Amino acid sequence: MSDVSTNLYKSQLLDYYYQRRAESSINKGSRFLISKAVFGTSSLVTKKGDGTYEIGELPKAFELAELTSQFCTINLVPTYSGGIITVRMDLDQSQLQEGKNYPFNTLVVLDNENKPIAIICVQEDSLYVGKTYTAVMAINTTTA
């Protein structure tokens, strides 16, 4: 499998992911669960003068309020096998308005406290009823 160019896609586990996972393992706070994903846009992806898009450096901390738009929130059912957590995120078209175009460039993965644990940025796209979109994130649990 070839690597995807960082001009097209970048993802980042946030520091908060590691903090919550560690705290949960020692029974501090609520149990840590990968729970939801939010489709939207952020200023992490910018349009250049030539009309192409640039994905900036992804931060280690990100707040949901930093999304410049949000249009779809889905529940997640991650799976685990061989040290890999797989998170599949399918656009829920029932949350979209027929005939409306939704600019998209950022997915935010949330824990069960509705706080961001990971971000995914892609080249600017348009999502709408009739267009499917699926993103898959693999988290290797054997490395930090």
Swiss-Prot record:
This is Tail fiber protein R. Structural or assembly protein of tail fibers. The lineage of its organism: Viruses, Duplodnaviria, Heunggongvirae, Uroviricota, Caudoviricetes.
